[in-house]
């Protein structure tokens, strides 16, 4: 059985990688799909191409994981790919309420099942938004993101990191 792991991945975090790595042990193939999210329009730090490149680098050691992108309804993408399972990571109960609603809708309109994977406890506080904020101040992020994301964030916020490194 194959699955799709969708998200905006702006950037991919260690929490994403934890869920993805565990999903890669559960499914024959997992397609990490960078989705266009209309609610996040204009709020991405990284371009689509940058996010795809970061993900390709971060997932290079996972042979049954491939990276793709899509703009549209997730259930349409899942059907086009011949998949029937969506993987979603959960950090807290508040994530579950929202994800449960989406899972029910996806099953109703696309006959797609959703598998929830709880983030490891030590990643439950990590979000892409928080990582970007910490990075924007030159803070330490190496434990919260894979090396590819850290390098990309350091490039985006080079001026801030250069000042901290010189101090």
Curated annotation (Swiss-Prot):
It catalyses: (R)-4'-phosphopantetheine + ATP + H(+) = 3'-dephospho-CoA + diphosphate. One of its GO terms (molecular function) is pantetheine-phosphate adenylyltransferase activity. It is found in: Cytoplasm. Disulfide bonds: none annotated. CDD domains: PPAT. GO terms for biological process: coenzyme A biosynthetic process. InterPro entries: Cyt_trans-like (IPR004821), PPAT (IPR001980), Rossmann-like_a/b/a_fold (IPR014729). Pfam families: CTP_transf_like. Pathway: Cofactor biosynthesis; coenzyme A biosynthesis; CoA from (R)-pantothenate: step 4/5. It comes from the Bacteria. ATP binds at residues 8-9, 16, 89-91, 99, 123-129. The record marks 16 as: Transition state stabilizer. GO terms for cellular component: cytoplasm. SUPFAM superfamilies: Nucleotidylyl transferase. PANTHER family: PHOSPHOPANTETHEINE ADENYLYLTRANSFERASE. Belongs to the bacterial CoaD family. Homohexamer. This is Phosphopantetheine adenylyltransferase. It comes from Deinococcus radiodurans (strain ATCC 13939 / DSM 20539 / JCM 16871 / CCUG 27074 / LMG 4051 / NBRC 15346 / NCIMB 9279 / VKM B-1422 / R1). The gene is coaD.
């Amino acid at each position: 059985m194959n699955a799709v792991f969708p998200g905006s991945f702006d950037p991919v975090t260690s929490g994403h990688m934890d869920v993805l790595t565990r999903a890669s042990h559960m499914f024959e193939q997992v397609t990490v799909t960078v989705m266009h999210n209309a609610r996040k329009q204009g709020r991405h730090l990284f371009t689509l191409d940058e996010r795809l490149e970061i993900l390709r680098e971060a997932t290079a050691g996972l042979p049954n994981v491939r990276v793709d992108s899509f703009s549209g309804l997730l259930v349409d993408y899942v059907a086009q790919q011949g998949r029937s399972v969506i993987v979603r990571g959960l950090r807290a109960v508040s994530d579950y309420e929202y994800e449960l609603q989406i899972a029910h809708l996806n099953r109703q309109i696309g006959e797609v099942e959703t598998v929830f994977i709880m983030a490891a406890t030590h990643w439950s506080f990590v979000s892409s938004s928080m990582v970007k904020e910490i990075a924007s101040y030159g803070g330490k992020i190496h434990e919260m993101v894979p090396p590819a994301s850290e390098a990309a964030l350091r490039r985006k916020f080079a001026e801030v990191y250069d000042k901290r490194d010189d101090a």
